[in-house]
Amino acid sequence: MAGSQIGTLFQVATFGESHGLALGGVVDGCPAGLELSEADLQGDLNRRRPGQSRFTTQRQERDEVKILSGVFEGRTTGTPIGFIIENEDQRSKDYSEIKDKFRPGHADFTYWSKYGNRDYRGGGRSSARETAIRVAAGAIAKKLLRQAEGVTVRGALTGMGPVVIEPSRWDWAEVERNHFFSPDAGSVGEFEAYLEGIRKAGNSVGAFLEVHAEGVPIGLGEPVFDRLDADLAKAVMSINAVKGVEIGAGMASGHATGVDFADEMRPGVDARHPEFVRNHAGGILGGISTGQPIVIRFAVKPTSSILVPRQSVDVHGQACEVVTKGRHDPCVGIRAVPIAEAMVAMTLADHWLRWRASKPL
């Protein structure tokens, strides 16, 4: 199976399945000399960890990461950084009833069709369990960006089903104060009431999220096929359940006029650093970062693993009914926040290394 690696200079590869012995990853290309410990990775892993509220899967995983290589005496050596997370709370028997059935809306059918087999235990490689390793790799990228350029990458859940947060109600300080990663304290009760009904019905729901990257230097991105926005969209779209991504004004651009949409400029601190009046472009023009905040919005679909009976077919092509009894998130968007931050940080770290290597004299 190809496709388990991303990046050009800052390369990340992952391995492992939902119900396997462990998950693992390798980060290759991180410069030598970066102070790094398992605690640096564990902080973001704890934000993603399951079982922290009744609104996420009740699978209990400590997600304790072990660094195996690439770090000596507290600093990166410039060699590949290998790390591993053991799986501790698999309940494969929960999936025995669907081992020959395809869950509607799941990767079961496509994996089976392409490879001639599939790991039905929790979805195997297609499970969001794999993203724990991405979060660990993203923590390395975050620290590199923060120390090298002062870049911050942070995300939030901005909507779920009919509950949508207005931008005027945003407060980044609230994001880490609630288990929804909501930037609006007033929305938490609404999210809880709505999702409780979804959970009790054995159903699931989609969500909207945003990631902002601030402090990104001007010049990241390689036209034309390695545009920064294209690579960011690819990275975010690689997350399980993501079905739509937009940069800046995104789809609303189709309703705008040139007068409305133009990000006008005025003199700044010097000729190379003008001041932008607005940021409809989301911090990227021509595939290259402008120095403004990079703003990415995306939507995740409802998880396909629900208790509501649905019609499907089995591996023999016969009609069947599917009910998924495992432990699942009623809204995968909640834990997608640190995952998306990781994918954005990894992409920015990769482009930062490329930018550093190609800066003009």
UniProtKB/Swiss-Prot annotation:
Necessary cofactors: FMNH2
Annotated positions binding FMN: 125-127, 240-241, 286, 301-305, 327
GO terms, molecular function: chorismate synthase activity; FMN binding
Single biological process term from Gene Ontology: chorismate biosynthetic process
Record text on cofactor binding: Reduced FMN (FMNH(2)).
EC top class named in words: lyase
The EC number(s) this enzyme carries: 4.2.3.5
UniProt superkingdom: Bacteria
Family of the protein in this entry: Belongs to the chorismate synthase family.
HAMAP family membership: Chorismate_synth
UniProt name for this protein: Chorismate synthase
Organism field: Magnetococcus marinus (strain ATCC BAA-1437 / JCM 17883 / MC-1)
